[in-house]
Amino acid sequence: MSTQFVFANYAFYRKVSNTCKFYRVSIDEKKMSLIKNKDGSYNFSIEMESLRNNFEMVMLVGFISVGQAMSHQESFAKKKPGYSAIIPGDTEVTVTVPVSRQNTIITAKATADQIRQLSDGKVDTAAFMRLIKDSIQTL
């Protein structure tokens, strides 16, 4: 594992965590995973918990925080020669919703382009949810 990947991994996690805290969504960095695939691409997954009625907001904050981390990586790559930004091609957000005795688990996936559209303000949150609606699953 290269030192650049380790640093980028830490920076990515910190940016995601700080953005979630900004939106008052608690997050555990141990429930984040940034994986480098054999082809050199990256996948990111995050597990979050919501209250009964706000799982959509928590899910959106997860995707927004990944978008902020991607922007941070890109701006850092412009400043530092030889540094390549860590941009996950696919991101999966899993939200645990406490409903009755058993929790409901809702997952959704989005591509880097979809997340970038959301974080850049090109689509609003409702349009973003329509973009990813086919990937949303209840487990």
Predicted regions located by residue number:
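Intrinsically disordered/low-complexity terminal segments and short unstructured peptides
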Residues: 1-2, 93
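Short, non-transmembrane amphipathic alpha-helical segments
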Residues: 56-78
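Polar/charged, Gly/Pro-rich intrinsically disordered segments
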Residues: 11-50, 77-139
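Short histidine-centered catalytic/ligand-binding loop motif
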Residues: 51-55
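Boundary at the C-terminal end of the N-terminal hydrophobic targeting segment
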Residues: 2-11
